[in-house]
């Protein structure tokens, strides 16, 4: 079943967040010793401030994880209830005034609550952090502070946080806490670094705070042909197939999309139903943009239309080039193009960073290139013999970048 992450906006969603905190912190973990706590919810005065956002993850209709983000205010940040950040604040303020002529914009992360059934599933935890980072980006954050449980330090360390003082036992929380700090550019690079070069800044700059996220298992349908269009999507991790059925129910694969690919946005603007079906091919994480948010931004900022037209111009050019490949390229050329696109979306091997790995096999490549699987295997065997790659039934390991022929190189330039 899919998991959806979003910023809580309704009374019901906020109540789900407050109840989840109580379930996790008090019922499951025995934290927060105060007798004054609500018997069903955990809420404090930082939840009442103007610049606060709560990110919540849902499986079906059940809240399974949540995190709060606060923008700096006259009463400080939640982390400062437990630690003195005044020296850090003074240092950052002087540094930013000297270099930029204005002070830093500090935000705080707090109240990380994850249901026990999901606590060891890092895809949910990291997706929660990524959704929160989208809000921080829209707030022009420069630094993030937090007071965290000592046992969660390894999670925050991966994102770019560093410990800035000794741990301290908090009687009111019933836990050992650590003060941590991260420059937001590190958090942003962790969140959007690899996708930032593939998705137009039009989407990041205008919709970042409205991004939802969707975590899918293999075979889950994102949307179906003929259904109304309510969202646009970008692939953050994984693969998505786009297919269409004709009146006789014959299925045609239109594309396999990987990291950085934007899809579903055309139907958002023309108001028509979907003309294809989108399906997750493997464990996949998507960034989701709701139709009403997108249209509101365009109505409020007509100057954004230039950026939007630029995006659609690039999409048309890519479609023209792909049509040229499918119409005129020999089967070998089609496989070369498919491999080139696969290289762009493959991820570096952790042990050998110069090697890239894509969890896609010959059968899926054949569907993408619209050729026989035997032809794909023939090309793969030739490249394997030359030391370019290794492959299996469900994986391709690139040992070096693929070289494309003159035909595919020519397609990089649009004829119009």
Where are these regions (language model features)?
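Short amphipathic alpha-helix that is part of the acyltransferase structural core
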Residues: 1-43, 49-58, 63-64, 198-203, ...
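Short, His- and charge-rich active-site/binding loops that engage polyanionic ligands
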Residues: 56, 60-92
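Acyl-donor binding region in acyl/amide transferases
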Residues: 79-163, 167, 174-181
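Ligand-binding loop in jelly-roll beta-barrel domains
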Residues: 102-103, 269-292
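A small-molecule sensor/coupling module
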Residues: 128, 273-275, 293-333
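Phosphate-/nucleic-acid-contacting segments
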Residues: 142, 147-149, 157-183, 187, ...
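Regulatory nucleotide-sensing modules
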Residues: 196-248
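Short acidic-glycine-tyrosine-enriched beta hairpin
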Residues: 248-263
